[in-house]
Design a protein with these regions (language model features):
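Flexible glycine/proline-rich, aromatic-decorated loop/lid segments
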Residues: 137, 181, 188-204, 443
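An N-terminal boundary/leader segment
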Residues: 1-53, 82, 285-295, 346, ...
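Glycine-rich, small-residue loops and helix-cap segments
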Residues: 29, 69, 110, 279, ...
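Acyltransferase
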Residues: 102, 251-252, 275-302, 324-336, ...
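Structural recognition of the beta-strand scaffold that forms the well-ordered cores
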Residues: 42-44, 71-74, 107, 114-118, ...
Length: 506
């Protein structure tokens, strides 16, 4: 009931119900954070100006925006106006108070949203080490999955996914380089949309990769994701890759029709499944719903040279990480003493008990050794990864099979939080292609495995967000409601699982 009421409150504000005010909605959201956050550790800090923002919205009721009075949480690698630092989860940035809004945050405010606070994340958006624990940062500690508190929320937008799933807010903003919106959305049983690269500005976001970075909504449902996307999409002169955004931005809500699946052809990425029989079983149920709603499904069993994408992508990410982070840190406030990636590496070494007790920084060290954006090896890797994932990947599969979208399981169900071995993930899911190609990727909850959510991915060509949201909405409506989180300590707390693990009766 709590989750349903939270959603209805935001919907009432959007539709103009006189009984609600932005201040009342914000106070209710603050109360939910204070009550629920101690269990999942998703929210780093509440913005002390949140109630003032809400009161200002109430004074403007005659000119309310489409997100009027909606409290929204922001991942803590995205800058916001006010006193909160933007830390990327690192103690090296604990004093990074820029007192400015990223353009996407300004868009949320202009649409009437209340910036409620900042969410925890995988430190440095999970680009420090291959042995990391998703959802952990030195600033925020470990975020947990509200469906089982010993399970990982994925990352790097861990707090955003966990907070929405827990019912603290209806929407949060995440960022993604490869899986960092869609994975935490899927594992926490909520909707996540990674937009086309260039639809949403990256200005004033702590960077990893100019080729793959973007921000996007994590939301309670597809409708809320569409509303939020409409507020954050748009061109930004400071981010040239967004030059075409205004031309492609559209009314995303208009695409949300219950019959959107009728008569469409959708490709089924069989090569993205097969690593988990329980997930495959849920995936087959989801495919059955798509068929029942009138979609024609086309089997796609392989993608040539898919195994070559990862190595090329790694060269791109390492090279662009050094270039992008050095540029960001060079303009950080004087209170930030780390001005280069090399400085951050030295800081982590000097503060190893706080920063590196659980895992190291070998990816940072690899990035520091790269030779810059003019390096022929980098240029070749970027061209190769874009071709294999884009032109010869997503685009080729869409064209060759005459389909409008591709579907697959997003990720495995959540793994255990493991302070000994780091993340232990059983499969890679469907999303890597869209991340590398720079094309949109929507994940919608499709069911659960032993009570742990799994997501269904919808992917399409560049600028096809409206189409994907429409397909996802039609699927969501046909699928029906799914269980809300119960904040159980472990999957083993469920009687059916406990019975399976108990010794046989003699």
């Amino acid at each position: 009931m709590r989750v349903i009421l939270a959603t209805l409150a935001a919907g009432a504000l959007a539709s103009g119900a006189a009984a609600q005010t932005a201040e009342a909605n914000t106070r209710a959201a603050i109360a939910r954070v204070e009550r629920l956050n101690p269990q999942v550790n998703a929210v780093l800090a509440l913005d002390p100006t949140a109630l003032d923002q809400a009161r200002a919205q109430d004074r403007m009721r005659r000119v309310r925006g489409p997100l009027f009075g909606m409290p929204i949480l922001i991942k803590d690698n995205i800058e916001t106006l006010g006193p909160l630092p933007t830390t990327a989860g690192s103690l090296a940035l604990k004093d990074n108070v820029t007192n400015r809004d990223a353009p996407l945050v300004a868009g949320l405010r202009a649409a009437g949203a209340v910036i409620l606070g900042k969410t925890n994340l995988s430190e440095w958006a999970n680009i420090r080490s291959n042995a990391s624990i998703s959802g952990w940062s030195a600033v925020g500690g470990q975020t947990r999955n509200p469906y089982a508190l010993d399970r990982n929320p994925c990352g790097s937008s861990s707090g955003s996914g966990s907070a929405v799933a827990a019912g603290m807010v209806d929407a949060a903003i995440g960022s993604e380089t490869d899986g960092s919106i869609t994975c935490p959305a899927a594992l926490n049983g909520v909707v996540g949309l990674k937009p086309t690269i260039g639809l949403v500005s990256r200005t004033h976001i702590v960077p990893i990769s100019a080729s793959q970075d973007t921000a996007g909504p994590i939301a309670r449902d597809v409708t809320t994701a569409a509303r939020v996307l409409g507020a954050i999409a748009g061109s930004d002169a400071a981010d040239p890759v967004t030059a075409a955004a205004d031309a492609h931005r559209t009314d995303y809500l208009a695409a949300l029709r219950p019959d959107a699946l009728k008569g469409v052809r959708i490709g089924v990425l069989r090569f993205s499944a097969g690593w988990s029989k329980p997930v495959d079983a849920v995936f087959e149920q989801a495919l059955g719903i798509l068929r029942a709603q009138g979609a024609t499904l086309v089997e796609i069993t392989e993608l040539k040279d898919r195994d070559k994408i990862g190595a090329a992508e790694n060269i791109v990410l390492m090279t662009e990480l050094k270039a992008g982070l050095n540029a960001y840190l060079a303009t950080a406030p004087a209170t930030v003493k780390t001005r280069t990636l090399a400085d951050v590496i030295a800081f982590n070494t000097a503060n190893a008990p706080q920063e590196m007790a659980l895992f190291g920084q070998e990816l940072f060290e690899t990035a520091e050794k790269t030779k810059g954006l003019d390096d022929p090896a980098y240029k070749a890797a970027r061209a190769l990864s874009l071709r294999l994932a884009g032109k010869d990947g997503i685009d080729a599969m869409l064209a060759a099979n005459n389909v409008v979208a591709l579907v697959g399981p997003t990720m495995p169900a959540a793994w255990l939080i493991d302070a000994v071995n780091g993340d232990q993930v059983s499969g890679s899911g469907a999303g890597n292609l869209a991340a590398v190609a720079g094309t949109p990727h929507l994940t919608v909850p499709m069911g659960n495995v032993r009570g742990m959510p799994v997501g269904l991915s919808f992917m399409g060509p560049a600028w096809s967000e409206a189409r994907l949201l429409g397909l996802g909405f039609a699927y969501e409506q046909a699928r029906g409601p799914l269980p809300a989180p119960t904040f159980r300590k472990s999957v083993e707390d469920s009687p059916d699982v406990a019975a399976l693990l108990a010794p046989a009766k003699r």
